[in-house]
């Protein structure tokens, strides 16, 4: 073969190899482009599918949800407000006493006041304080005390009421206390005062101290029994305060509400002394009221300047009341009007 033919064959072969190489490259590029396009398409389709799964269109999907029916709530029961009670109107027109004050113990409400804060003489209502202080200072009610002539004679000579103990007679503290509050015995007051404080004067100082402690601002005591003295005075409001405090003491309350009592036997009185409450005696043995209430107890007082007085305790419809009346005259039959006044006031409740 000639050299020129050989050269031509060689060039032809190289050209064929180049063309083949170009075809391979073009094919690879086309395949790469197709592959890239396929990848892009897959990614695009996958994104749309995720969007369709996670966020469905409100237009294409309807969610059915049952809404519970609202129940009508039963109306909450409300308490019917209690009617406001009308204020009590206690008339004083039918009273014979010139001084009177009615106190409701539950709330210290003064329901009636007829000169109840004006200065007045307490007479034997004084003995409420005397008995109270003796009880607070002599806890042993069975303690023996001998009554002396000095404790009896002055009171007797002044015409004071007496319990009936004799000079030299030895009796219990309990007997003396009943002697103070039931028959209003002045000698019993003196005997207790001497035992507690050593003298009546020293005991009176204790009485005035106690009055100040209780807020009895318009009260001043001079005697232990209530015998008249111009400087021995109080108001019926102060007496009501005193009695309210005193009845909180069980011993005082028991004695104050007792109609009668017999003292212990002594040589002078082998059968004891029969003591009776002056208030219960004037009630005629009938403490009941027309409205179903009852007068539970009381302490009377009688003295020229004070007239007839009464500090009483009543229970009406489950409520307790204290009524203090004073400067009442005798009725035509000689019975003090204080009992009629007490019934008149209490029956209005």
Spans of features found by a protein language model:
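Active-site-adjacent loops and short helices of periplasmic peptidoglycan-processing enzymes
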Residues: 52-54, 58, 63-70, 74-237, ...
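Penicillin-recognizing serine hydrolase domain
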Residues: 61, 87-99, 199-349
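Structured C-terminal helix/loop/strand segments within mature extracytoplasmic catalytic/sensor domains
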Residues: 2-82, 87-94, 99, 106-112, ...
